[in-house]
Regions:
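Exported/periplasmic ABC-transporter solute-binding proteins
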Residues: 26-145
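The feature marks either
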Residues: 13
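N-terminal secretory signal peptides that target proteins for export/translocation
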Residues: 1-6
Length: 145
């Protein structure tokens, strides 16, 4: 009986892990449909969103549009593209603000707001769930470097 109980718990635990993985949405980096930016590396995306760079590789200004704290899309984006958790990100920006070296990107409520801001400004860059991409924005290929 003990074996069956343990096996059942193991299967249940596996199902929970699989379910949470499947629930995570694919997050993509987006720019305005008219933006000349064609691709970025993961490091370039991280540098723009962490305040280490305010320019695209072409030299044009890059204006990052963030999503609000606590957003699952935001947490997924920063984990995948910068390797930082929500707590690490908060600590990062606290340090940057305290030393006077910058401010975090403007944050909007959701993917629809990100698209609205980006569609009107070809210098903007943001992130949304892949299923939210439409004709107003273009998903950028991001090289894993």
């Amino acid at each position: 009986m003990g074996f069956l109980k343990r096996a059942g718990c193991t299967v249940a635990g596996f199902a929970l892990c699989l379910g949470s993985t499947l629930a995570m949405a694919e997050v993509v980096v987006v720019v305005a449909a008219a933006s000349p930016v064609q691709a970025l590396t993961r490091n370039q995306v991280a540098d723009i969103f962490l305040g280490k760079s305010n320019r695209f590789p072409s030299g044009k200004q890059a204006i990052p549009i963030d999503q609000t704290e606590g957003s699952a899309t935001r947490d997924e984006f920063y984990t995948v593209f910068t390797g930082k958790s929500a707590a690490q990100l908060k600590a990062h920006w606290s340090k940057i603000i305290f030393t006077g070296r910058g401010q975090p990107p403007e944050a909007v409520a959701n993917g629809a707001e990100v698209k609205k801001r980006i569609a009107g400004n070809p210098d903007s860059i943001g992130y949304i769930e892949a299923r939210e991409v439409d004709a107003s924005v273009r998903a950028l290929p991001v090289d894993p470097q």
